[in-house]
A protein has these predicted regions:
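Extended hydrophobic leader/signal-anchor segments used for secretion and membrane insertion
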Residues: 1-182
Length: 182
């Protein structure tokens, strides 16, 4: 049987962990456990209407999937619950911008290119199915429209613009900075 001090120690540690987690979320810190980005802690920065306007190639951003769900493929992935590690379809989707308005995305021999330069993180061919479920796909080559961005995942099987195409800058909720990654 545990003594009262041991029980109170366990309760105190649990309360500290829960309180620290809640405080981190309020401070704009997010934990990423998905393989789509390096695992670790991320700080949400510039979470206002200027985030989408100011974001450029190489920036990590979070996309509000409810805002982007007018895109039929984003809506498909949301209904499957595949746009977040937790399975909650209302989570923000964190990706890297690899193309902006005016850029051209092409595919050659299974590699994806933006303006003739291969993606540095994710050069693998797109999956066509998950089990027997066909996945949406984007016809390439594709010129990115002004006011849109092309997103890439760090993981070869990550859900990104290879499946849903360019997304509107207005769906960018925040820019993201790594606080600590593995």
């Amino acid at each position: 049987m545990r003594t009262k001090p041991t029980v109170w120690l366990i309760v105190g540690v649990l309360a500290g962990v829960l309180g620290g987690t809640a405080g981190a979320v309020q401070a704009g810190v997010r934990i990423n456990l998905s393989p789509s980005m390096p695992k670790g802690l991320y700080r949400l920065v510039q979470c206002d209407e200027t985030a989408g306007r100011d974001a450029g190639v190489g920036d990590w951003v979070v996309i509000d999937t409810t805002e982007a769900s007018s895109n039929p493929s984003v809506a498909f992935f949301r209904t499957q619950g595949w746009l977040s590690y937790s399975g909650r379809s209302d989570d923000l989707l964190m990706k890297t911008i690899v193309g902006v308005g005016g850029d051209e995305v092409t595919e050659k021999v299974g590699r994806l290119y933006v303006n003739g330069t291969p993606f540095t993180k994710n050069a693998s061919r797109r999956q066509r199915t998950v089990g027997t479920l066909p996945l949406p796909s984007v016809e390439l080559p594709q010129r990115i429209n002004e006011g849109e961005v092309w997103l890439s995942s760090d993981h070869e099987k990550g859900i990104d613009s290879r499946y849903f195409g360019a997304v509107a800058r207005s769906s960018i909720a925040c820019k993201v900075e790594a606080a600590w990654t593995l």
